[in-house]
Design a protein with these regions (language model features):
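Acidic, PIN/NYN-like endoribonuclease modules and their adjacent C-terminal/linker elements
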Residues: 1, 108-139
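Short secondary-structure boundary/capping segments
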Residues: 1, 24-28, 66-67, 75, ...
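Short, well-structured N-terminal submotif of metal-dependent ribonuclease cores
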Residues: 1-40, 49-66, 139
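Short, structured coil segments at secondary-structure junctions
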Residues: 30, 71, 129-130
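A generic structural signal for short hydrophobic patches within well-formed alpha-helices
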Residues: 10, 41-44, 83, 126
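Residues that scaffold the ATP/ADP-binding catalytic core of kinase and kinase-like folds
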Residues: 12-13, 25, 47, 86-89, ...
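Active-site neighborhoods of divalent-metal-dependent phosphate/nucleic-acid chemistry enzymes
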Residues: 46-54, 70-117
Length: 139
């Protein structure tokens, strides 16, 4: 299955003891079938930038650098096609009374535009966008 990893998936994998179901799923996947949105990279970088200078911030910054290198060629940008798709799915979610944050909408639009399934624990955040979903914590 070709998946776009939501930020919560990537963040969970940094924990000393990540969720066992997620860890098993991630280990069983072919790395070339896993993608990141540029939005996820931004969310991770924002999180590290918010930390006070010190060892934890330095370690997480180094990890983020390594993540970007390991997903080289598989970090999908928000281009005009993704932005247009976001406008469509965000408007649909708003019409149904379920507006969602911009970042989630852009991640969903990226997945739709590239024919990917969003891997996330936060299924409720993505359902209004009509994107294919997979919860590696539960499925």
């Amino acid at each position: 299955m070709r998946c776009l990893l939501d930020t919560c998936v990537v963040s969970e994998l940094t924990k000393p003891k990540p969720n066992p179901e997620l860890a098993r799923w991630f280990a069983s996947e072919h790395v070339e079938d896993l993608y990141l949105s540029a939005i996820t990279i931004g969310e991770i970088r924002r999180g590290t930038a918010q930390l006070a200078p010190g060892r934890r911030r330095a370690a997480l910054t180094a990890w983020a650098d390594k993540l970007s290198r390991s997903f080289s060629g598989r970090i999908l940008p928000v281009d005009e096609a993704v932005a247009t798709r976001w406008a469509e799915i965000a408007a649909s979610a708003e019409r149904s009374g379920k507006p969602k944050p911009l970042a989630d909408g852009l991640i969903a639009a990226t997945a739709v535009q590239h024919g990917l399934t969003v891997a996330t624990r936060n299924v409720d955040d993505f359902e209004p966008f009509g994107v294919m979903l997979f919860n590696p914590w539960a499925d």
